[in-house]
């Protein structure tokens, strides 16, 4: 029964669509009508309001940190259930007919909550890739791939969860992958 409560509460926290809420409140617009139509931080940056984009990023990270850290310290056996549920809440929010974001910021919150070093592996990989390419999507894919790769190569740690997360992030970026392949992907300005 506890795992159901963990899963549901983590999903509900993860499903709070901060990009949608913030653009509605501060810009009086629907973020789904802007840029890629995605509710996440990268598309929030495309609104032209960097503060709104960074606020979305921080809130999307936080909505994963809260349930995952709580579960980590109170129900550690369910940490991956909480993590996956928060991620799925962001990607498939009940409030927006299950059409959410791509889950990268939420995944960053998950990583830092599980192990700060894994969060750093992602951030460093993301930053290096972004500095070279200027593609947020490619950076997100590389960052999410580097976490299980790091665990496989350098740690004696079960990387199955992180491989699953990479596959899910790849899935949420499938259109970006097509655009990258066709050299049609839009570069991202983060500053």
UniProtKB/Swiss-Prot annotation:
Catalytic activity from the UniProt record: an acyl phosphate + sn-glycerol 3-phosphate = a 1-acyl-sn-glycero-3-phosphate + phosphate
Keywords associated with the record: Cell inner membrane, Cell membrane, Lipid biosynthesis, Lipid metabolism, Membrane, Phospholipid biosynthesis, Phospholipid metabolism, Transferase, Transmembrane, Transmembrane helix
GO biological process, one term: phospholipid biosynthetic process
Organism of this sequence: Pelagibacter ubique (strain HTCC1062)
InterPro entries on file: G3P_acylTferase_PlsY
Function: Catalyzes the transfer of an acyl group from acyl-phosphate (acyl-PO(4)) to glycerol-3-phosphate (G3P) to form lysophosphatidic acid (LPA). This enzyme utilizes acyl-phosphate as fatty acyl donor, but not acyl-CoA or acyl-ACP.
Subcellular locations according to the entry: Cell inner membrane
Record's protein name: Glycerol-3-phosphate acyltransferase
Entry keyword annotation includes Transport: no
Entry EC no(s): 2.3.1.275
Stretches that traverse the bilayer: 3-23, 51-71, 78-98, 108-128, 150-170
Subunit structure: Probably interacts with PlsX.
Pathway, per record: Lipid metabolism; phospholipid metabolism
Higher taxonomy: Bacteria, Pseudomonadati, Pseudomonadota, Alphaproteobacteria, Candidatus Pelagibacterales
Domain of life of the source: Bacteria
Protein's UniProt keywords contain NAD: no
Any one annotated GO CC term: plasma membrane
Similarity remark: Belongs to the PlsY family.
Alphabetical list of NCBIfam families matching this protein: glycerol-3-phosphate 1-O-acyltransferase PlsY
Gene this chain is encoded by: plsY
EC main group: transferase
A single GO molecular function term of this UniProt record: acyl-phosphate glycerol-3-phosphate acyltransferase activity
Main localization, broad class: membrane
Membrane topology: Multi-pass membrane protein
